[in-house]
Amino acid sequence: ITNVYRLLAYAALERQPAQYRAAADFLIQLRDQSRESQDFAEVNRLIGDCYFLNRDFANAVDFYSAALSRGVGSPRDGELFLRLISAQVRAGLIEQASQLIDQADSSGSISQADRWRAEWNVAQALQASGELDLALQRVRLLLRDDSPSTVPASLDIRLRWLESYLSLQAEELDGLANRVALLLARLVTMPPQQEGAGDALTPKEARLLKTEILLLQGSVYMREGDANAGMGVLTQLRDEYGETTAALRSYLIEAAYHGLIGDFVSAQATMTKLAEIYPQNPLAPQALFEAALYCERRGAEFYPQAVVLYNDLATQYATDPLFYYARLKQGNLLRSMNNFAGAQIVYENLINGFPAHEMRYIAELSRADCMLALAGNDFDGLADVAVILERLLDLPNLPLDFQAEAAQKWAFALIKRGSIEKAKEVLWLSADRFIGDGEKAVALGAAGRYWLARSMLQLGEIFEEQDNLAEARKVYRQVIAYNLPGRHIAISRVDQILVLE
Protein backbone atom coordinates (compact mmCIF):
# COMPACT_ATOMS: atom_id res chain seq x y z
CA ILE A 1 0.00 0.00 0.00
CA THR A 2 2.89 2.38 0.71
CA ASN A 3 4.13 1.96 -2.85
CA VAL A 4 0.69 2.94 -4.12
CA TYR A 5 0.75 6.19 -2.14
CA ARG A 6 4.28 6.90 -3.40
CA LEU A 7 3.15 6.44 -6.99
CA LEU A 8 0.05 8.59 -6.50
CA ALA A 9 2.09 11.39 -4.90
CA TYR A 10 4.66 11.17 -7.71
CA ALA A 11 1.91 11.31 -10.35
CA ALA A 12 0.35 14.38 -8.72
CA LEU A 13 3.71 16.18 -8.74
CA GLU A 14 4.41 15.24 -12.36
CA ARG A 15 1.18 16.76 -13.63
CA GLN A 16 1.26 20.15 -15.38
CA PRO A 17 0.75 22.20 -13.36
CA ALA A 18 1.86 20.16 -10.37
CA GLN A 19 -0.93 19.20 -7.95
CA TYR A 20 0.87 20.01 -4.70
CA ARG A 21 -2.18 19.74 -2.46
CA ALA A 22 -3.12 16.33 -3.87
CA ALA A 23 0.47 15.14 -3.48
CA ALA A 24 0.44 16.30 0.15
CA ASP A 25 -2.74 14.30 0.81
CA PHE A 26 -1.19 11.13 -0.63
CA LEU A 27 2.01 11.69 1.36
CA ILE A 28 -0.03 12.05 4.55
CA GLN A 29 -1.51 8.61 3.83
CA LEU A 30 2.01 7.29 3.24
CA ARG A 31 3.26 8.83 6.49
CA ASP A 32 0.50 7.18 8.48
CA GLN A 33 1.83 3.80 7.28
CA SER A 34 5.35 4.60 8.48
CA ARG A 35 6.84 2.98 11.59
CA GLU A 36 10.35 4.38 11.54
CA SER A 37 10.92 7.76 13.20
CA GLN A 38 13.34 8.87 10.49
CA ASP A 39 10.90 7.91 7.72
CA PHE A 40 8.15 9.75 9.57
CA ALA A 41 10.29 12.89 9.75
CA GLU A 42 11.32 12.68 6.10
CA VAL A 43 7.74 12.29 4.85
CA ASN A 44 6.61 15.21 7.02
CA ARG A 45 9.34 17.28 5.41
CA LEU A 46 8.08 16.31 1.95
CA ILE A 47 4.51 17.18 2.94
CA GLY A 48 5.75 20.54 4.20
CA ASP A 49 7.51 21.09 0.86
CA CYS A 50 4.26 20.44 -1.01
CA TYR A 51 2.34 22.93 1.09
CA PHE A 52 5.18 25.46 0.78
CA LEU A 53 5.19 25.18 -3.01
CA ASN A 54 1.40 25.58 -2.92
CA ARG A 55 1.95 28.80 -0.93
CA ASP A 56 0.06 27.35 2.03
CA PHE A 57 2.75 28.45 4.44
CA ALA A 58 0.76 27.94 7.65
CA ASN A 59 0.34 24.21 6.93
CA ALA A 60 3.96 24.00 5.80
CA VAL A 61 5.00 25.32 9.23
CA ASP A 62 3.04 22.56 10.97
CA PHE A 63 4.62 19.73 8.98
CA TYR A 64 8.15 21.17 9.06
CA SER A 65 7.80 21.53 12.84
CA ALA A 66 6.68 17.92 13.15
CA ALA A 67 9.57 16.77 10.96
CA LEU A 68 12.11 18.74 12.96
CA SER A 69 10.85 17.42 16.29
CA ARG A 70 11.09 13.79 15.09
CA GLY A 71 14.30 14.08 13.12
CA VAL A 72 16.66 15.64 15.67
CA GLY A 73 20.24 14.69 14.97
CA SER A 74 19.82 14.00 11.27
CA PRO A 75 22.32 15.56 8.85
CA ARG A 76 19.46 17.50 7.21
CA ASP A 77 18.42 19.35 10.39
CA GLY A 78 20.03 22.62 9.27
CA GLU A 79 18.29 22.61 5.92
CA LEU A 80 14.97 21.71 7.54
CA PHE A 81 15.40 24.42 10.17
CA LEU A 82 15.90 27.05 7.46
CA ARG A 83 12.83 25.83 5.58
CA LEU A 84 10.77 26.12 8.75
CA ILE A 85 12.00 29.67 9.38
CA SER A 86 11.24 30.64 5.78
CA ALA A 87 7.71 29.19 6.04
CA GLN A 88 7.08 30.98 9.35
CA VAL A 89 8.22 34.29 7.91
CA ARG A 90 6.02 33.91 4.83
CA ALA A 91 3.08 32.93 7.03
CA GLY A 92 3.52 36.16 9.00
CA LEU A 93 4.76 34.32 12.12
CA ILE A 94 7.82 36.54 12.50
CA GLU A 95 7.84 36.57 16.29
CA GLN A 96 7.55 32.78 16.35
CA ALA A 97 10.46 32.51 13.90
CA SER A 98 12.58 34.85 16.04
CA GLN A 99 11.89 32.79 19.15
CA LEU A 100 12.76 29.56 17.34
CA ILE A 101 16.10 31.02 16.21
CA ASP A 102 16.91 32.18 19.75
CA GLN A 103 16.01 28.79 21.23
CA ALA A 104 18.01 26.88 18.64
CA ASP A 105 21.01 29.15 19.14
CA SER A 106 20.88 28.78 22.93
CA SER A 107 20.68 24.99 22.71
CA GLY A 108 23.42 24.78 20.10
CA SER A 109 21.21 22.74 17.79
CA ILE A 110 22.05 24.79 14.68
CA SER A 111 25.32 25.92 13.18
CA GLN A 112 26.44 29.53 13.35
CA ALA A 113 26.10 29.83 9.58
CA ASP A 114 22.52 28.53 9.64
CA ARG A 115 21.65 30.99 12.36
CA TRP A 116 22.99 33.84 10.23
CA ARG A 117 21.00 32.64 7.23
CA ALA A 118 17.85 32.45 9.35
CA GLU A 119 18.44 35.94 10.75
CA TRP A 120 18.70 37.25 7.18
CA ASN A 121 15.15 36.06 6.49
CA VAL A 122 13.76 37.35 9.77
CA ALA A 123 15.44 40.76 9.50
CA GLN A 124 14.04 41.35 6.03
CA ALA A 125 10.57 40.29 7.18
CA LEU A 126 10.76 42.59 10.19
CA GLN A 127 11.72 45.52 7.99
CA ALA A 128 8.89 44.78 5.55
CA SER A 129 6.40 44.70 8.44
CA GLY A 130 7.57 48.08 9.78
CA GLU A 131 9.72 46.71 12.62
CA LEU A 132 12.88 48.40 11.35
CA ASP A 133 14.42 49.04 14.78
CA LEU A 134 13.97 45.42 15.84
CA ALA A 135 15.44 44.17 12.56
CA LEU A 136 18.48 46.38 13.02
CA GLN A 137 18.84 45.31 16.64
CA ARG A 138 18.88 41.60 15.77
CA VAL A 139 21.40 42.00 12.94
CA ARG A 140 23.73 44.13 15.05
CA LEU A 141 23.55 41.64 17.91
CA LEU A 142 24.63 38.97 15.47
CA LEU A 143 27.56 40.97 14.10
CA ARG A 144 28.80 41.91 17.59
CA ASP A 145 29.23 38.28 18.60
CA ASP A 146 32.92 37.96 19.56
CA SER A 147 33.03 34.16 19.50
CA PRO A 148 35.21 32.54 16.80
CA SER A 149 33.32 32.74 13.53
CA THR A 150 32.64 29.76 11.30
CA VAL A 151 30.49 31.87 8.99
CA PRO A 152 31.56 31.93 5.31
CA ALA A 153 32.99 35.28 4.27
CA SER A 154 30.32 35.62 1.59
CA LEU A 155 27.54 35.34 4.20
CA ASP A 156 29.36 37.74 6.51
CA ILE A 157 29.49 40.36 3.73
CA ARG A 158 25.79 39.90 3.01
CA LEU A 159 24.81 40.43 6.64
CA ARG A 160 27.04 43.48 6.95
CA TRP A 161 25.47 44.90 3.80
CA LEU A 162 22.05 44.29 5.37
CA GLU A 163 23.10 46.07 8.56
CA SER A 164 24.27 49.07 6.54
CA TYR A 165 21.11 49.08 4.44
CA LEU A 166 18.89 48.97 7.54
CA SER A 167 20.97 51.74 9.13
CA LEU A 168 20.28 53.93 6.10
CA GLN A 169 16.56 53.22 6.32
CA ALA A 170 16.66 54.13 10.02
CA GLU A 171 18.51 57.40 9.24
CA GLU A 172 21.45 56.27 11.42
CA LEU A 173 24.17 57.77 9.25
CA ASP A 174 27.00 58.13 11.76
CA GLY A 175 30.00 56.24 10.37
CA LEU A 176 27.83 54.56 7.75
CA ALA A 177 29.69 55.84 4.67
CA ASN A 178 32.96 54.51 6.07
CA ARG A 179 31.47 51.08 6.86
CA VAL A 180 30.08 50.77 3.35
CA ALA A 181 33.41 51.83 1.80
CA LEU A 182 35.26 49.19 3.86
CA LEU A 183 32.72 46.57 2.87
CA LEU A 184 33.19 47.40 -0.81
CA ALA A 185 36.97 47.27 -0.48
CA ARG A 186 36.74 43.90 1.26
CA LEU A 187 34.56 42.49 -1.51
CA VAL A 188 36.82 43.78 -4.27
CA THR A 189 39.92 42.22 -2.67
CA MET A 190 38.34 38.81 -2.09
CA PRO A 191 40.10 36.09 -4.11
CA PRO A 192 38.07 34.51 -6.92
CA GLN A 193 36.18 31.34 -6.19
CA GLN A 194 38.26 28.21 -6.20
CA GLU A 195 36.94 24.69 -6.47
CA GLY A 196 36.10 23.33 -3.03
CA ALA A 197 36.22 26.75 -1.33
CA GLY A 198 32.96 26.93 0.60
CA ASP A 199 33.17 30.56 1.64
CA ALA A 200 34.02 32.07 -1.75
CA LEU A 201 31.59 33.93 -3.97
CA THR A 202 30.79 32.86 -7.50
CA PRO A 203 31.46 35.57 -10.10
CA LYS A 204 27.69 36.07 -10.40
CA GLU A 205 27.27 36.45 -6.63
CA ALA A 206 30.23 38.81 -6.40
CA ARG A 207 28.85 40.95 -9.21
CA LEU A 208 25.42 41.14 -7.58
CA LEU A 209 26.85 42.07 -4.20
CA LYS A 210 29.12 44.70 -5.70
CA THR A 211 26.27 46.40 -7.53
CA GLU A 212 24.13 46.41 -4.38
CA ILE A 213 26.97 47.85 -2.30
CA LEU A 214 27.64 50.53 -4.92
CA LEU A 215 23.95 51.43 -4.92
CA LEU A 216 23.98 51.60 -1.13
CA GLN A 217 27.12 53.74 -1.15
CA GLY A 218 25.59 56.20 -3.60
CA SER A 219 22.41 56.32 -1.51
CA VAL A 220 24.36 57.05 1.67
CA TYR A 221 26.26 59.91 0.04
CA MET A 222 23.01 61.36 -1.30
CA ARG A 223 21.31 61.07 2.09
CA GLU A 224 24.26 62.85 3.69
CA GLY A 225 23.84 65.70 1.20
CA ASP A 226 27.00 64.96 -0.78
CA ALA A 227 25.26 64.86 -4.16
CA ASN A 228 28.48 65.02 -6.18
CA ALA A 229 29.97 61.95 -4.50
CA GLY A 230 26.64 60.15 -4.66
CA MET A 231 26.14 60.85 -8.36
CA GLY A 232 29.72 59.79 -9.02
CA VAL A 233 29.05 56.36 -7.52
CA LEU A 234 25.67 55.99 -9.23
CA THR A 235 27.20 56.97 -12.57
CA GLN A 236 29.94 54.37 -12.07
CA LEU A 237 27.27 51.78 -11.32
CA ARG A 238 25.37 52.64 -14.51
CA ASP A 239 28.49 52.71 -16.67
CA GLU A 240 29.95 49.41 -15.44
CA TYR A 241 26.78 47.43 -14.66
CA GLY A 242 24.08 49.15 -16.70
CA GLU A 243 22.08 45.96 -17.26
CA THR A 244 21.63 45.18 -13.55
CA THR A 245 18.60 45.93 -11.40
CA ALA A 246 20.82 47.97 -9.09
CA ALA A 247 21.67 50.31 -11.97
CA LEU A 248 17.98 50.67 -12.76
CA ARG A 249 17.11 51.40 -9.13
CA SER A 250 19.83 54.03 -9.02
CA TYR A 251 17.50 56.29 -10.99
CA LEU A 252 14.91 55.93 -8.23
CA ILE A 253 17.52 56.99 -5.68
CA GLU A 254 18.54 59.98 -7.77
CA ALA A 255 14.95 61.09 -8.36
CA ALA A 256 14.12 60.76 -4.66
CA TYR A 257 17.07 63.00 -3.80
CA HIS A 258 15.99 65.66 -6.31
CA GLY A 259 12.45 65.50 -4.96
CA LEU A 260 13.68 65.80 -1.39
CA ILE A 261 15.46 69.09 -2.11
CA GLY A 262 12.53 70.41 -4.17
CA ASP A 263 14.15 70.05 -7.59
CA PHE A 264 11.07 68.55 -9.23
CA VAL A 265 12.33 69.33 -12.74
CA SER A 266 15.36 67.06 -12.28
CA ALA A 267 13.29 64.45 -10.47
CA GLN A 268 10.83 64.33 -13.37
CA ALA A 269 13.64 64.14 -15.92
CA THR A 270 15.32 61.29 -14.04
CA MET A 271 12.15 59.21 -13.90
CA THR A 272 11.42 59.88 -17.56
CA LYS A 273 14.96 58.79 -18.44
CA LEU A 274 14.52 55.54 -16.52
CA ALA A 275 11.39 54.73 -18.52
CA GLU A 276 13.18 55.54 -21.77
CA ILE A 277 16.26 53.42 -21.01
CA TYR A 278 14.37 50.42 -19.59
CA PRO A 279 11.02 50.46 -21.43
CA GLN A 280 10.47 46.71 -20.98
CA ASN A 281 11.24 46.65 -17.27
CA PRO A 282 8.32 46.30 -14.83
CA LEU A 283 9.49 49.52 -13.15
CA ALA A 284 9.02 51.57 -16.33
CA PRO A 285 5.30 52.27 -15.73
CA GLN A 286 6.07 53.27 -12.15
CA ALA A 287 8.78 55.61 -13.44
CA LEU A 288 6.34 57.36 -15.78
CA PHE A 289 3.76 57.60 -13.00
CA GLU A 290 6.27 59.19 -10.63
CA ALA A 291 7.50 61.51 -13.39
CA ALA A 292 3.93 62.75 -13.78
CA LEU A 293 3.60 63.22 -10.02
CA TYR A 294 6.77 65.31 -9.95
CA CYS A 295 5.46 67.28 -12.92
CA GLU A 296 2.26 68.05 -10.98
CA ARG A 297 4.31 69.33 -8.07
CA ARG A 298 5.95 71.89 -10.36
CA GLY A 299 2.69 73.85 -10.44
CA ALA A 300 -0.62 74.21 -12.26
CA GLU A 301 1.02 75.54 -15.42
CA PHE A 302 2.62 72.10 -15.91
CA TYR A 303 -0.60 70.12 -15.53
CA PRO A 304 -0.93 69.68 -19.33
CA GLN A 305 2.52 68.09 -19.41
CA ALA A 306 1.57 65.77 -16.54
CA VAL A 307 -1.59 64.77 -18.44
CA VAL A 308 0.60 63.75 -21.38
CA LEU A 309 2.84 61.64 -19.11
CA TYR A 310 -0.15 59.82 -17.62
CA ASN A 311 -1.45 59.26 -21.14
CA ASP A 312 1.93 57.87 -22.23
CA LEU A 313 1.79 55.38 -19.37
CA ALA A 314 -1.75 54.31 -20.23
CA THR A 315 -0.94 54.01 -23.94
CA GLN A 316 2.33 52.10 -23.58
CA TYR A 317 1.38 49.88 -20.63
CA ALA A 318 -2.33 49.21 -21.04
CA THR A 319 -2.14 45.94 -19.08
CA ASP A 320 -0.20 47.33 -16.12
CA PRO A 321 -2.06 47.78 -12.79
CA LEU A 322 -1.04 51.45 -12.83
CA PHE A 323 -3.11 52.00 -15.99
CA TYR A 324 -6.30 52.58 -14.00
CA TYR A 325 -4.66 54.97 -11.57
CA ALA A 326 -2.94 56.89 -14.36
CA ARG A 327 -6.29 57.45 -16.05
CA LEU A 328 -7.83 58.55 -12.74
CA LYS A 329 -5.01 61.05 -12.25
CA GLN A 330 -5.40 62.21 -15.84
CA GLY A 331 -9.10 62.85 -15.27
CA ASN A 332 -8.42 64.67 -12.01
CA LEU A 333 -5.94 67.00 -13.70
CA LEU A 334 -8.35 67.71 -16.54
CA ARG A 335 -10.94 68.69 -13.93
CA SER A 336 -8.39 70.95 -12.24
CA MET A 337 -7.89 72.58 -15.65
CA ASN A 338 -11.70 73.03 -15.94
CA ASN A 339 -11.84 70.55 -18.82
CA PHE A 340 -14.83 68.73 -17.36
CA ALA A 341 -15.96 67.27 -20.68
CA GLY A 342 -12.57 65.68 -21.31
CA ALA A 343 -12.37 64.40 -17.75
CA GLN A 344 -15.86 62.90 -18.01
CA ILE A 345 -14.82 60.90 -21.08
CA VAL A 346 -11.80 59.53 -19.19
CA TYR A 347 -13.94 58.43 -16.24
CA GLU A 348 -16.62 56.89 -18.45
CA ASN A 349 -14.01 54.86 -20.30
CA LEU A 350 -12.75 53.53 -16.97
CA ILE A 351 -16.26 52.68 -15.77
CA ASN A 352 -17.15 50.89 -18.99
CA GLY A 353 -13.78 49.20 -19.44
CA PHE A 354 -13.35 48.03 -15.84
CA PRO A 355 -16.83 47.48 -14.39
CA ALA A 356 -15.54 45.24 -11.59
CA HIS A 357 -12.48 47.30 -10.60
CA GLU A 358 -12.09 47.82 -6.86
CA MET A 359 -11.68 51.59 -7.37
CA ARG A 360 -14.69 51.96 -9.65
CA TYR A 361 -16.51 54.10 -7.09
CA ILE A 362 -13.85 56.81 -7.47
CA ALA A 363 -14.40 56.95 -11.22
CA GLU A 364 -18.19 57.00 -10.68
CA LEU A 365 -18.06 59.85 -8.17
CA SER A 366 -15.56 61.81 -10.28
CA ARG A 367 -17.78 61.44 -13.34
CA ALA A 368 -20.71 62.75 -11.29
CA ASP A 369 -18.60 65.78 -10.31
CA CYS A 370 -17.94 66.49 -13.99
CA MET A 371 -21.61 66.13 -14.89
CA LEU A 372 -22.60 68.38 -12.01
CA ALA A 373 -20.18 71.06 -13.19
CA LEU A 374 -21.38 70.79 -16.80
CA ALA A 375 -25.08 70.69 -15.91
CA GLY A 376 -25.19 74.18 -14.43
CA ASN A 377 -28.89 74.79 -13.85
CA ASP A 378 -30.08 72.39 -16.55
CA PHE A 379 -32.99 70.43 -15.07
CA ASP A 380 -32.41 67.23 -17.05
CA GLY A 381 -28.66 67.29 -16.51
CA LEU A 382 -29.12 67.63 -12.76
CA ALA A 383 -31.61 64.76 -12.82
CA ASP A 384 -28.99 62.53 -14.48
CA VAL A 385 -26.45 63.46 -11.81
CA ALA A 386 -28.93 62.64 -9.05
CA VAL A 387 -29.62 59.21 -10.55
CA ILE A 388 -25.90 58.39 -10.84
CA LEU A 389 -25.19 59.41 -7.24
CA GLU A 390 -28.17 57.45 -5.96
CA ARG A 391 -26.90 54.33 -7.75
CA LEU A 392 -23.40 54.96 -6.45
CA LEU A 393 -24.66 54.68 -2.88
CA ASP A 394 -26.01 51.23 -3.73
CA LEU A 395 -22.54 49.90 -4.63
CA PRO A 396 -21.35 47.19 -2.20
CA ASN A 397 -18.43 47.93 0.12
CA LEU A 398 -18.45 51.67 -0.62
CA PRO A 399 -16.06 53.29 1.90
CA LEU A 400 -17.78 55.37 4.56
CA ASP A 401 -16.07 58.61 3.55
CA PHE A 402 -17.35 58.21 0.00
CA GLN A 403 -20.84 57.41 1.27
CA ALA A 404 -20.86 60.74 3.09
CA GLU A 405 -19.52 62.60 0.04
CA ALA A 406 -21.92 60.99 -2.45
CA ALA A 407 -24.92 61.69 -0.23
CA GLN A 408 -24.04 65.37 0.13
CA LYS A 409 -23.54 65.81 -3.61
CA TRP A 410 -26.75 63.93 -4.37
CA ALA A 411 -28.65 66.31 -2.11
CA PHE A 412 -26.88 69.29 -3.69
CA ALA A 413 -28.01 68.21 -7.17
CA LEU A 414 -31.57 67.77 -5.90
CA ILE A 415 -31.57 71.23 -4.32
CA LYS A 416 -30.32 72.82 -7.56
CA ARG A 417 -33.24 71.29 -9.46
CA GLY A 418 -35.73 72.38 -6.79
CA SER A 419 -36.42 68.97 -5.18
CA ILE A 420 -36.07 70.31 -1.64
CA GLU A 421 -38.11 67.64 0.15
CA LYS A 422 -36.21 64.82 -1.55
CA ALA A 423 -32.92 66.56 -0.72
CA LYS A 424 -34.00 66.89 2.90
CA GLU A 425 -34.75 63.17 3.01
CA VAL A 426 -31.33 62.31 1.57
CA LEU A 427 -29.53 64.59 4.02
CA TRP A 428 -31.52 63.26 6.95
CA LEU A 429 -30.81 59.63 6.04
CA SER A 430 -27.10 60.40 5.63
CA ALA A 431 -26.92 62.13 9.02
CA ASP A 432 -28.83 59.31 10.68
CA ARG A 433 -26.58 56.69 9.04
CA PHE A 434 -23.54 58.11 10.77
CA ILE A 435 -24.78 59.98 13.84
CA GLY A 436 -27.24 57.21 14.66
CA ASP A 437 -24.47 54.61 14.50
CA GLY A 438 -21.66 55.45 16.89
CA GLU A 439 -19.24 52.98 15.28
CA LYS A 440 -19.70 54.53 11.83
CA ALA A 441 -19.27 58.03 13.22
CA VAL A 442 -15.96 57.05 14.82
CA ALA A 443 -14.83 55.21 11.67
CA LEU A 444 -15.23 58.30 9.47
CA GLY A 445 -11.99 59.83 8.27
CA ALA A 446 -11.26 63.54 7.95
CA ALA A 447 -12.84 63.72 4.49
CA GLY A 448 -15.94 61.85 5.62
CA ARG A 449 -16.39 64.13 8.63
CA TYR A 450 -16.11 67.15 6.32
CA TRP A 451 -18.85 65.87 3.99
CA LEU A 452 -21.07 64.82 6.89
CA ALA A 453 -20.73 68.29 8.39
CA ARG A 454 -21.69 69.88 5.07
CA SER A 455 -24.75 67.64 4.86
CA MET A 456 -25.87 68.49 8.37
CA LEU A 457 -25.32 72.23 7.96
CA GLN A 458 -27.27 72.07 4.68
CA LEU A 459 -30.05 70.14 6.43
CA GLY A 460 -30.16 72.74 9.18
CA GLU A 461 -30.49 75.51 6.58
CA ILE A 462 -33.45 73.74 4.98
CA PHE A 463 -35.18 73.40 8.35
CA GLU A 464 -34.56 77.11 9.05
CA GLU A 465 -35.99 78.11 5.66
CA GLN A 466 -39.07 76.04 6.49
CA ASP A 467 -39.34 77.75 9.92
CA ASN A 468 -38.70 74.45 11.68
CA LEU A 469 -36.28 76.01 14.14
CA ALA A 470 -36.48 73.21 16.69
CA GLU A 471 -35.24 70.61 14.18
CA ALA A 472 -32.60 73.01 12.85
CA ARG A 473 -31.29 73.58 16.37
CA LYS A 474 -31.22 69.82 16.98
CA VAL A 475 -29.14 69.24 13.84
CA TYR A 476 -26.69 72.02 14.67
CA ARG A 477 -26.24 70.70 18.20
CA GLN A 478 -25.31 67.31 16.78
CA VAL A 479 -22.61 69.00 14.70
CA ILE A 480 -21.33 70.60 17.90
CA ALA A 481 -21.59 67.41 19.96
CA TYR A 482 -19.61 65.35 17.44
CA ASN A 483 -17.05 68.16 17.00
CA LEU A 484 -17.48 68.10 13.23
CA PRO A 485 -15.86 70.64 10.89
CA GLY A 486 -17.96 73.81 10.87
CA ARG A 487 -18.64 73.49 14.60
CA HIS A 488 -18.28 77.26 15.10
CA ILE A 489 -20.80 77.90 12.31
CA ALA A 490 -23.22 75.57 14.06
CA ILE A 491 -22.71 77.38 17.38
CA SER A 492 -23.39 80.74 15.71
CA ARG A 493 -26.56 79.42 14.09
CA VAL A 494 -27.83 77.98 17.38
CA ASP A 495 -27.29 81.38 19.01
CA GLN A 496 -29.22 83.09 16.19
CA ILE A 497 -32.10 80.62 16.57
CA LEU A 498 -32.27 81.29 20.31
CA VAL A 499 -32.51 85.03 19.59
CA LEU A 500 -35.32 84.47 17.08
CA GLU A 501 -37.21 82.26 19.50
Task: Set out the residue ranges of the language-model regions.
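Acidic, polar-rich low-complexity tracts and alpha-helical solenoid repeat scaffolds
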Residues: 1-501
